[in-house]
């Protein structure tokens, strides 16, 4: 289990030039498995996967399929975990909440009027949502009522993050992790909460067309889904630096790790 990272200072600033690579170590790759959006669920100790169909799949942290069901949404483009289940999005502005067995919790809705091309989605510890879109390239924080709390344009980063596809956050370091696909750098961007670029790690040697990213925080296990490459790669990951004073709420430890 990773040690607590509290008591360290908050890093501030904006994107800086020449970021290095994070400490990322490839463990294994699951081939012939399409993953366009992935999210770690501490409550069930597993990884939820969307493959741009009507289904979502639950995997163990070791990559074994545990569950699969129809969501009732024609196409699931992105997903994230909430207390009562999953928030799913079709990539065209429609969102829906379902429980962990696939039953609808509420009717389809719009999370925010500004969202039309949602590629990646992550519910943060404070209840707000980190969202990435690629047309235009932007990273946003959206309040539960739809208010835009932060909007950063990826083409202004150094190096540019032009095709952000998946997003998650490490509750220990506070860092935001974003993958962009082969129309961009096919890399993992590690960002401070304000968008400062901490590291950029190329992923092309592990797979083609990175689109999903998830993190099991207590072990530092990182999952990257490759769409065009039809693969799920598993890594050990260590943050470049700590950008928050106190670790965020992350849910229960996984009993099977």
Put a short name on every predicted segment.
Residues 31, 40-42, 47-53, 87-93, ...:
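Conserved beta-strand positions in repeat-built beta-propeller and related beta-rich domains
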Residues 60-64, 99-103, 143-147, 191-196, ...:
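Short loop/turn segments that connect beta-strands within beta-propeller blades
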Residues 23-30, 64-70, 104-111, 148-159, ...:
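A short beta-strand motif characteristic of beta-propeller blades
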Residues 55-57, 94-97, 138-141, 187-189, ...:
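A short loop-to-beta-strand structural motif that recurs across blades of beta-propeller domains
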Residues 51-62:
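Beta-propeller domains
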Residues 212-257:
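Blade-level signature of beta-propeller repeat domains, shared across WD40, Kelch, NHL, RCC1
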Residues 31-44, 72-83, 112-126, 157-174, ...:
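Beta-rich, blade/repeat-based domains predominating
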């Amino acid at each position: 289990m990773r040690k607590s990272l509290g008591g360290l200072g908050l890093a501030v600033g904006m994107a800086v030039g020449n970021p290095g690579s994070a400490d990322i170590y490839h463990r294994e790759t699951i081939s012939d498995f399409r993953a366009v959006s992935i999210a770690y669920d501490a409550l069930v100790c597993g990884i939820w996967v969307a493959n741009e169909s009507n289904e979502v799949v639950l995997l163990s942290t070791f990559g074994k399929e545990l569950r699969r069901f129809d969501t009732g949404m024609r196409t699931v483009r992105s997903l994230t975990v909430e207390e009562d289940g999953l928030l799913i999005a079709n990539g065209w502005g429609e969102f829906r909440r379902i429980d962990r067995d696939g039953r609808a919790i509420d009717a389809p809705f719009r999370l925010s009027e500004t969202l039309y091309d949602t590629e990646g989605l992550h519910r943060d510890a404070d209840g707000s949502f980190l969202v990435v879109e690629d047309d235009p390239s932007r990273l946003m924080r959206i309040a539960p009522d739809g208010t835009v709390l932060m909007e950063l344009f990826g083409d202004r980063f150094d190096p540019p993050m032009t095709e952000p596809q998946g997003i998650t956050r490490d509750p220990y370091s506070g860092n935001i992790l974003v993958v962009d696909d082969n129309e961009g750098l096919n890399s993992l961007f590690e960002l401070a909460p304000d968008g400062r670029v901490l590291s950029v790690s190329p992923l092309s040697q592990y797979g083609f067309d990175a689109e999903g990213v998830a993190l099991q925080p207590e072990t530092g296990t990182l999952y990257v889904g490759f769409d065009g490459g039809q693969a799920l790669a598993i890594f050990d990951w260590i943050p470049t630096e700590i950008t928050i004073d106190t670790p965020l709420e992350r849910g229960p430890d996984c009993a099977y790790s």
